[in-house]
UniProtKB/Swiss-Prot annotation:
PANTHER family: NICOTINAMIDE-NUCLEOTIDE AMIDOHYDROLASE PNCC (PTHR13939), NMN AMIDOHYDROLASE-LIKE PROTEIN YFAY (PTHR13939:SF0). Belongs to the CinA family. This is CinA-like protein. Gene3D superfamilies: 3.30.70.2860, CinA-like (3.90.950.20), MoaB/Mog-like domain (3.40.980.10). It comes from the Bacteria. Signal peptide: none annotated.
Length: 406
């Protein structure tokens, strides 16, 4: 199996200013493409640091992916470092320079002169077009090794990495299969899977997330692809409604897909999540076909005046109650004229809890023409973790309803 190293360039990474999300994405895509990632390294914006990381990785890596350091500023030094490391020339590509300047002039009146730095191309490198930003990537084939240079911003890096992998065309020795599960502990899921896997060549990797549940990756030699498919079906039989979907699917993707399949529309009334559930849904292209809208009723006055939650309910039971979420769901469903409505109200903390309703208490209601399901859950975590867990369970509740599993 071909090996790969990932080098992330940027002082903002090693100083802890920003989270290195690129590393996770690149690891996933390289593994999916059949490459074995053997190391990840983060280095400063320094030519010698970059060169040292590259030279070290050249010893045992077939592919090296570098992200960051391709901008126009003084501290963008990845191109120069690679050229020096490989002892290759680097020169200004006039045609590329004009293309970059033309792109920038569409959005800005002034085109800085230092933008020409982004048109410096390493000898014999293939240019990777950037359709989002201004910094092109480069693909360098050198003495049997492949170096992929990508910009740092994730929205630029991700499509460019996919294009680079199409150019490289690695031949995977492994067959891989990914699955997403929700509302089942990682340990329990792992126990279920390991109890039915008796082939030592089948590898199991699980990753739990408050945002999406548990993602499982099964891998085996390519010749056993059919066995992996059979294994996945057996896992689904044993986990039932906990299975969300195959591949890199998310809860929100699954919701939009199933709403379309069932020809149902959805509206949401959010309190403690502050619009997080709605935000996740609108990340999915085509969501407007089935997701009509949402009301963030964070203050009781909005619950009362917009969603028509009665004063009696708010005074007697409080905003965090089954009675309140029931009226919130019916209120938003009537306003939006949707088939289904979800309402959530909870106590995110750190204050506001009581003995009967401690911080972390949350109520959900999903309502339809002949459907009403109310649930109370308890997530005693830090505020943003609480909101992530509530948003995820809200999406899962919609899926369960649509799948007639309530």
């Amino acid at each position: 199996m071909k090996t790969a190293s990932i080098i992330t360039v940027g002082s903002e990474i090693i100083e802890g200013i920003i989270l290195n999300t690129n590393e996770k994405y690149i690891c996933y895509k390289l593994t999916e493409a059949g490459l074995k990632v053997i190391r990840t390294i983060s280095v400063d914006d320094d030519i010698e640091s970059i060169k040292n990381a590259v030279n070290y990785s050249l010893n045992d890596s077939d592919v090296i992916v570098l992200s960051g350091g391709l901008g126009p500023t003084e501290d963008d030094k990845t191109r120069e470092a690679i050229a020096e490391s490989l002892k290759l020339k680097i020169a200004l590509n006039e045609e590329l320079k004009k293309a970059i300047e033309k792109r920038i002039s569409k959005y800005h009146r002034y085109v800085p002169s230092n933008i020409a730095k982004q048109a410096m191309v390493i000898e014999n490198a293939k240019i990777l077009e950037n359709h989002v930003g201004s910094a092109p990537g480069q693909l360098v084939f050198h003495k049997g090794k492949i170096l992929v240079l990508l910009p740092g911003p994730p929205q630029e890096l991700e499509p460019m990495l996919n294009n680079a992998l199409n150019e490289i065309k690695p031949q995977p020795d492994l067959s891989t299969l990914s699955m997403l599960f929700f509302s089942i502990p990682e340990a329990e899921l792992d126990e279920i899977i390991t109890s039915i896997v008796h082939d030592t060549s089948v590898k199991i990797a699980t990753q739990a997330s408050y945002f999406d549940g548990v993602r499982v990756r099964l891998s085996a030699p390519k010749a056993k692809a059919e066995e992996l498919t059979k294994l996945s079906k057996k896992i689904i039989e044993l986990t039932g409604e906990k299975f969300i979907g195959y591949g890199n699917i998310t809860l929100e993707e699954a919701v939009i897909k199933l709403l379309k399949k069932k020809h149902q529309t959805l509206s949401i009334a959010e309190s403690c999540t502050g619009g997080m559930i709605s935000s996740r849904l609108v990340n999915i292209p085509g969501a407007s076909e089935v997701f009509l809208g949402a009301i963030v009723a964070y203050n009781n006055s909005v619950k009362r005046n917009i969603l028509n939650v009665s004063n009696k309910i708010l005074e007697k039971y409080g905003a965090v109650s089954q009675q309140c979420v029931a009226e919130m769901a019916e209120g938003v469903r009537k306003i939006m004229k949707s088939d289904l409505a979800l309402a959530v109200s909870g106590i995110a903390g750190p204050t506001g809890g009581s003995e009967k309703k401690p911080v972390g208490t949350v109520y959900f209601c999903i309502a339809g023409e002949s459907i009403k399901d109310i649930q109370r859950l308890f997530y005693p975590q830090q505020r943003n973790v609480f909101r992530s867990r509530v948003s995820a369970y809200g999406l899962y509740l919609i899926l369960k309803c649509l799948s007639n599993m309530l």
